[in-house]
Regions:
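Conserved, mostly hydrophobic/aromatic
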Residues: 8, 28, 45, 78, ...
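Alpha-helix N-cap and loop-to-helix initiation/capping positions
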Residues: 20-27, 58-59, 120-127, 155-159, ...
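Radical SAM enzyme [4Fe-4S]-AdoMet core and its adjacent flexible, acidic
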Residues: 53-73, 119-122, 182-213
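N-terminal pre-triad scaffold of radical SAM enzymes
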Residues: 1-9, 33-37, 41-44, 229
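Canonical Radical SAM [4Fe-4S] cluster-binding loop centered on the CxxxCxxC motif
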Residues: 1-26
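Internal alpha/beta loop-helix hairpins
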Residues: 176-181
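Terminal RNA-binding accessory module
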Residues: 190-254
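Conserved SAM/AdoMet-binding glycine-rich loop
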Residues: 37-157, 168
């Protein structure tokens, strides 16, 4: 699918990609079958808000089931979802199929309700934490990654601490962290309480230290376990090694 209807105050996607447009399940299934015939083992379903997919009453969970049923599809991933559209039905479908990867990208953006409201994210930190707990309940050992913006206009130190606190509660396997930068035509560009670059850098550095600790803790728990790894490319560090990903999206060098 293409486009987005969410209009987060920091995001230019609705202005550049337009409103949400979903393809029929049949057209997606046909394309996946052609990819399988060409030897592709892993399929990624893409969309700016992929789990808000809806076509003639069909849901994203139904699309996942249809793709999962295709013979020869060994792995299915999807990106990027919106937390508002993650639901129990989707999680139960993912848990029920072995070829749907045990991994979800779960963009938090902030752990402060005040900042989430200014971002127009349409969920609260409490809802986000609840759904993260449901993910781990329904899909044990699910890999969780996230996106987080630091230094959003008006963000106080206390609100930044709320984000760190929610990170501690959820413990993501990995995180894509960014200093806020204004985008043309967006509402946030017009906010007057812009944060200095020095403060943004200081907060980002502190956040990265915390995330590295969480990543290390979760990776250590995998030591001694058996994992299926799909080899994807030569390792950047050595032509004698290969790089691939586990079902839960951890990179492994072999």
């Amino acid at each position: 699918m293409r486009g987005c209807n969410k209009f987060c105050s920091f995001c230019i996607v609705p202005f550049t990609r337009g409103r949400e447009r979903s393809r029929s399940i049949e057209s997606v299934v046909d394309e996946v079958k052609k990819a399988v015939d060409q030897g592709f083992a892993e399929i990624t379903l893409l969309g700016q808000n992929v789990n808000s997919y809806k076509y003639e009453g069909n849901t994203f969970a139904e699309l996942l089931l249809a793709v999962s049923d295709i013979k020869g599809v060994k792995r299915i991933r999807y990106t990027s979802p919106h937390p508002q559209d993650i639901n129990v039905e989707l999680l139960e479908v993912m848990a029920s199929r072995k070829n749907i990867c045990n991994y979800i990208h779960f963009p938090m953006q902030s752990g402060s309700n005040e900042i989430l409201k200014r971002m127009n994210r349409t969920y609260t930190r409490e809802h986000f934490h609840y759904m993260a707990s449901k993910i781990r309940e329904i899909m044990p050992n699910c890999g969780l990654s996230t996106d987080i913006i630091v230094g959003f206009p008006g963000e106080t130190d206390e609100q930044f601490r709320e984000t760190l606190d929610l990170m501690e509660k959820v413990k993501f396997n990995s995180a894509y962290t960014f200093k806020y930068s204004p985008r043309p035509y967006t509402k946030a560009e017009q906010f007057t309480e812009q944060i200095s670059e020095d403060v943004k850098k200081e907060r980002l550095d502190e956040m990265l230290v915390l995330q590295r600790r969480h990543t290390l803790e979760l990776n250590k728990k995998m030591v001694g376990t058996y994992q299926q790894v799909l080899i994807e490319k030569e390792s950047k560090k050595s032509s004698n090694h290969w790089a691939g990903r586990t079902d839960s999206n951890e990179w492994v060098i072999i």
